[in-house]
Swiss-Prot record:
PANTHER family linked to this entry: CYTIDYLATE KINASE, CYTIDYLATE KINASE/PANTOATE-BETA-ALANINE LIGASE
Location(s), subcellular: Cytoplasm
GO cellular component annotations of the record: cytosol
SUPFAM superfamilies: P-loop containing nucleoside triphosphate hydrolases
GO biological process: nucleobase-containing small molecule interconversion; pyrimidine nucleotide metabolic process
Top-level taxonomic group: Bacteria
CDD domains the UniProt entry points to: CMPK
Name of the protein in its database record: Cytidylate kinase
A Pfam family it matches: Cytidylate_kin
Keywords for this protein: ATP-binding, Cytoplasm, Kinase, Nucleotide-binding, Transferase
EC number: 2.7.4.25
InterPro entries assigned to the protein according to its UniProt record, in alphabetical order: Cytidylate_kin, Cytidylate_kinase_dom, P-loop_NTPase
Organism, as annotated: Streptococcus pneumoniae (strain ATCC BAA-255 / R6)
């Protein structure tokens, strides 16, 4: 069985990271959460009170405090800037509400895409994000475009936030997700869109295992 590159794209809270982690584990592939990288850059910008126009300052910060990944004792992904663990802070609502703006900065995307492509050269990989199949890994053997209704995605995010102890409101989440969809699909640099050769998968009404099995079946055809 050969190792392949699997690119999973889709809007916010469509279940990309959850299924990508499981698929990577099942196949023994590396998992890379590219969204966490943009969240890390956003966290750095907010922490240092940098606006979207202060690009040079943000790039300098990312050089001084490189984004890296690790694993906890239970196998969960950890995110670092420099040697500081920011795994939990990057999931706060303030970061979530600003990440689209930071991710739309061409120079930031260029820097992080280069890092993502470097990591992908190491063998079998599952990568999820907004532009993996179109920009980061256009040569990936399997591209998946994962979608779900705004209502379902808001419910998922609501349950995640409650489980993490993050104060949240369902109706507000629906508005935020719809607004983020618009920003992600209308930005000039690497907008969210389906790659021509991607498999379209609507996960509305499906549980995680059902989605995983559908993607694994597609992957096995290509191995």
């Amino acid at each position: 069985m050969k190792t392949i590159q699997i690119a999973i794209d889709g809007p916010a809270s469509s279940g990309k990271s959850t299924v990508a982690k499981i698929i990577a584990k099942d196949f023994g592939f590396t998992y890379l959460d590219t969204g966490a990288m943009y969240r890390a850059a956003t966290y750095m910008a907010l922490k240092n009170q940098l606006g979207v126009e202060e690009v040079e300052a943000l790039l300098a910060l990312l050089d001084q405090h490189p984004i890296s990944f690790g694993r906890s004792e239970t196998g969960d992904q950890l995110v670092f800037v420099g040697d500081v663990d920011i795994t939990h802070p990057i999931r706060e609502n303030e970061v979530t509400n600003h990440v689209s703006a930071i991710a739309a900065i061409p120079e930031v995307r260029e820097k992080l895409v280069s890092l993502q492509q470097e990591i992908a050269q190491q063998g079998g990989i599952v990568m999820d994000g907004r532009d993996i199949g179109t920009v980061v890994l256009p040569q990936a053997e399997l591209k998946i475009f994962l979608v779900a209704s705004v209502d379902e995605r808001a419910e998922r995010r609501y349950k995640e936030n409650i489980a993490k102890g993050i104060e949240t409101d369902l109706e507000t989440l629906k508005k935020e997700i719809a607004a983020r969809d618009y920003k992600d699909s209308h930005r000039e640099t690497s907008p969210l869109k389906q790659a021509e050769d991607a498999v379209y998968l609507d996960t509305t009404g499906l549980n995680i295992q059902e989605v995983v099995e559908k993607i694994k079946a597609e992957a096995e055809k290509r191995m």
